[in-house]
Design a protein with these regions (language model features):
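Accessory, non-ATPase domains that flank or precede helicase/AAA+ motor cores in DNA-metabolism machines
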Residues: 1-313, 319-367, 382-398, 674-677, ...
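Short, ordered beta-strand-loop transition motifs
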Residues: 9, 473-474, 691-696
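A general secondary-structure junction signal
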Residues: 56-58, 108, 443-445, 528, ...
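Short intrinsically disordered coil segments
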Residues: 69-71, 406, 419-423, 666, ...
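Generic solvent-exposed, charged/amphipathic alpha-helical segments
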Residues: 90-93, 426, 430, 512, ...
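Inter-lobe coupling/hinge segments of SF2-like helicase ATPases
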Residues: 208-222, 230-661, 700-701, 733
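Long, largely alpha-helical accessory region at the distal end of helicase-like NTP-driven motors
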Residues: 438, 635-718
Length: 742
């Protein structure tokens, strides 16, 4: 740190500063002559101290010079923000209609003055989260121990009655296996809690493995190189299991060999180490990881290494903000994934599209990859903005998993259902387990049941802060709000009349319970937001678990050798969403899940249980849906939805619903008056499906904008109107602008 109060008498260098605040202007300060653009300096602003970034030097102030303050110090211990970073921030602020200060805060969330405090807070949260996961894991292990004890008792009883030597030998072997499993469970139960402050560190590998491609991969690889050489982003449309990762690795290795850095974006690397392990095998110490689960200290270490070295950086969307230099290649894996979109706080950016802009800033090639590309990326290929490369051949198995649609209404009529499982699916699971395979079951809701209802008066317990029902979590015996976290103990009795509360619907906890009852000899695990994801994935990957029940986390890019059957329960909840993207998302979810099985030679099986077997989504899954896909695009064109238009959502919140309705209506009228009604459409205000969260009522206004030369100007008009609306009224609510909402 360099301090210099009173040292600027000879030369007054007026600078403009970016502060980590929602400011629509950049304040002026006086600084020493040697301050450069991108330097970080400490200043006082509105009675508080901040670390800002110098955006301009030697400017002519448009205000009274006597009111301009001097900076407190130059933070010489903090690295200078590069010109490339500043360009990216400016683009994001303009495109996503936020302030550059909000982008700065996202890029450097732990400024010098708050890093220590933030590190303590995050460490505390990590400890609390680890304790909760530990309790869940202990509960699961105790239940598993009970099931193994029960199976062991049955086997020993059968052995005592057995007469044939062959039967005795088989039972003896099974007993030994169960005893080994029991000892392993007991060891886990007695093991000390892991050190939450300690993070996994990949061991050095001086001999990274070489990547060998199949003929189909070689062709795709060559086509990608041709496309990247042409200066356009490339979309690799490759079926699940086709070996896209191997192509990424080869391209990344070539970039490193040219002295370039590589950014490899993945939707959720914090959950599974599978991808990190594969990339570590390929790149050894040339691999850096960056994601939200890391401590601030680890993030700073990664950032420092990147500033001075050549690396492949594996990260989530936040890795876009790293101080990239000599960037040669950006890979966006699973580019369709919704987790690339930042929901809150600002900037509410789309990581995939921001990656394309980052590539343009650095002159780097951009490769998007997916087995189920987004409509936006497919449309960009049709219009010539992107180049598409297809990879239709699976690496180990030439065929997709066999699809079976089971009509649950028909099965229920003929008594073919046991709880939430059809007898047909039960038989498929038994067959798979008997052949030594594994099973994954998707249920797109966590908890035991999404709601409970009084059998006497019909009351459904709701969150006192949100307009939603409370979900029943049987393991913790609590009713929990999945929006704000509010919870109350579950007593089983109605608070109004004292009647019995009945669980309605089924979440992953209930499905797990049903699976354990149907297959008592199977080893069952659950993967959702309430379980220890890394531990569950590891045990399933190494074969210690037979059946995995999970939410949509199980559809992500895992690679399990023995997984040969995947099944979707209650699929109607996935295909019946009220959104213009509902069918697209359903197809992506199902195809991604389908691709998890049959990845090592044998053909897998994909079973969907639904009450709507003729839904267009299932026609698409059967491979005969090009006409349906074209129809979906025609509908979007007709009603003005992406990819043919741009959407902007204005989200208004207030604790007073009446006041909110009044101001939201006024806002909508002003927007409609300010935009050309012949080409722009203002819809609303309307209440979303969940119209109250954390004691705030919500209204939305949706704006459809044509993708023409006036798009930027119209978006600026929207931003200006919202700013004026916020500052010219005595309204205590707040407004959010969401560009390209999902």
């Amino acid at each position: 740190m360099t301090t210099f109060a009173g040292e600027m008498a000879d030369e007054r260098n007026c600078i403009k500063l970016i502060l980590p605040l929602k400011l629509n202007w950049e304040p002026y300060y006086y600084a020493p002559a040697d301050v450069k653009r991108g330097d970080r300096v400490s200043v006082h602003f509105s009675g508080r101290q901040y670390v800002g970034v110098v955006s301009q030097v030697r400017v002519h102030p448009q205000t009274d010079p006597s009111k301009i303050r001097e900076i407190d110090s130059i933070e010489t211990s903090l690295a200078r923000v590069s010109a490339g970073e500043l360009r990216l921030w400016a683009f994001m602020a303009e495109y996503y209609l936020c302030t550059i200060g909000e982008v700065y805060k996202a890029a450097y969330p732990y400024g010098k003055l708050s890093e220590e405090k933030a590190a303590v807070l995050i460490a505390k949260r990590r400890e609390e989260s680890a304790a909760r996961r530990r309790a869940e894991e202990q509960d699961r292990l105790l239940r598993l121990q009970g099931r193994i004890d029960e199976r062991l008792g049955r086997r020993k009883a059968s052995l005592a009655k057995a007469r044939k030597d062959s039967v005795k030998d088989r039972l003896t072997g099974e007993i030994k296996q169960l005893e080994c499993e029991l000892e392993a469970v007991k060891a886990k139960l007695s093991a000390p809690a892991p050190d939450t402050a300690k993070e996994e560190i990949l061991d050095a590998d001086p001999n990274p493995t070489e990547t060998k491609l199949s003929p189909a991969q070689e062709k795709a690889y060559a086509d990608i190189k041709t496309g990247l050489a042409g200066g356009k982003p490339v979309l690799l449309n490759g079926v699940t299991g086709s070996g896209k990762t191997e192509i990424y690795i080869k391209l990344a290795r070539e970039a490193l060999d040219r002295g370039k850095n590589v950014l490899y974006l993945s939707p959720g690397i914090a959950l599974s180490s599978q991808l990190a392990d594969r990339l570590h095998d390929a790149f050894g110490n040339d691999l850096l990881c960056f994601h939200s689960a890391q401590t601030p200290a680890r993030k700073r270490e990664t950032t420092a290494k990147l500033r001075s070295g050549r690396y492949v950086v594996l990260g989530t969307r936040s890795a876009l903000f790293l101080p990239h230099h000599d960037l040669g290649l950006i890979i966006v894996d699973e580019e369709h994934d919704s987790s690339y979109k930042q929901d809150s706080p600002a900037p509410r950016y789309q990581g995939r599209d921001t990656a394309v802009m980052l590539g343009s800033i650095h002159g780097a090639g951009v490769l998007l990859g997916s087995a189920t590309p987004s409509m936006e990326s497919l449309y960009n290929c049709v219009t010539g903005r992107y180049r598409m490369v297809e990879l239709r051949e699976r690496y180990f198995c030439s065929e997709d998993a066999e699809l079976q649609i089971i009509n649950t209404l028909a099965e229920r009529r003929k008594n073919g259902m046991v709880g939430n499982f059809s007898i047909k699916l039960i038989e498929e699971i038994r067959k798979t387990l008997s052949e030594g395979g594994q099973v994954a079951i998707l249920r797109a809701r966590r908890a035991y049941s999404p709601l409970v209802q009084c059998e006497a008066c019909g009351d459904i317990p709701k969150c006192i802060h949100c307009n939603v029902s409370l979900s029943y979590h049987r393991i913790s015996s609590r009713l929990i709000c999945h929006h704000c976290g509010y919870s109350i103990p579950f007593s089983g009795s109605c608070s109004l009349c004292g009647g019995s509360l009945k669980a309605l619907g089924a979440g992953t906890q209930k499905i797990e319970e049903e699976v354990q009852a149907l297959f008592p000899d199977a080893r069952v695990a659950r993967l959702d937001a309430d379980s220890d994801g890394r531990s569950v994935v590891k045990t399933f990957s190494d074969g210690s678990t037979d059946i995995l029940v999970g939410t949509q986390i199980v559809t992500k890019g895992f690679d399990f050798d023995r997984l040969s059957l995947v099944a979707v329960l209650l699929a109607d909840s996935i295909i019946s969403q009220q959104d213009f993207r509902a069918d697209e998302r359903a197809v992506q979810t199902f195809e991604q899940f389908r691709g998890r099985c049959g990845r090592r030679g044998s053909r897998g099986k994909f079973v969907i249980q639904t009450s709507q077997p003729t839904h267009p989504v299932y026609t698409l899954l059967k491979g005969g849906g090009q006409e349906i896909m074209n129809g979906m695009l025609d509908e979007r064109r007709q009603f003005g939805y992406p990819p043919f238009t741009r959407l902007v959502n204005i989200i208004l919140r207030d604790v007073n619903e009446g006041r909110l309705v009044k101001f939201a209506g006024e806002m909508a009228r002003k927007l409609a008056a300010s935009l050309d009604g012949n080409v722009c459409q203002v819809v609303g205000p309307f209440a979303p499906l969940v119209d109250k969260v954390s004691d705030e009522f919500i209204r939305r206004i949706r704006i459809h904008l044509p993708k023409d030369q006036s798009l930027t100007k119209r978006k600026a008009t929207i931003a200006s109107l919202v700013r004026d609306f916020e500052t010219s009224r005595s309204w205590i609510g707040h407004i959010v602008i969401d560009v390209d909402p999902l």
